[in-house]
Amino acid sequence: MKKKNIILGVLAAGTAAAFTGAGAVFHNIIVRKKQEPTDIIVAPDAVNGAERKQLWTESNCWLNERGSEKVSIQSFDGLILRGEFFEGEGEPDSTVLLVHGYRCNRRREYAAIARFYLEAGYNVLLVDNRAHGESDGRYIGFGILDRE
C-alpha cells in the first residue's frame, strides 16, 4: 500500500509539473500582451549599439518626414491588422512588402531597410503581424493566421 501511494504521488507530481511547464510555454510564447516598444533589433554583428541606435533614429525620422498612408485590413477572425504604405519616388511599378519577425514591430525592425528601398525607387508596405505593434490580437500566429 505504501509503495502504491509513493508511485501515485510521483505520478501526480510529474503530471502537475508537466501541466505547469506547458502552461508557462503557452503564455510566454503564444499569448502576447501589448507592450511598449523597447530597443531596436538589428543583426548583432551589423553595427555597434550606438551606431545601431543612430541608424534607427535617423531612418525613423526620415520616414516620418516622408509621410505614409496608414492602412488596415480585417482578418478572417475580425482582428484589425495595421501597416504603413510609403510611395516611392516617380512612378514605381514594384512594391516591397516588409514583414517583421517574432516579438517585434514594423518600424523597429525595418526602418532602415524601408528607407533603402524607398531611395531605390520602390513602394514599401510595412505591416504589423497580429499581436504585434499596432495590430490587434493576443495570440501570435507566426503568419499562419494572417495568410488569408
Sequence positions of predicted segments:
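A short loop-to-beta-strand scaffold at the N-terminal edge of the catalytic core in hydrolase folds
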Residues: 76-87
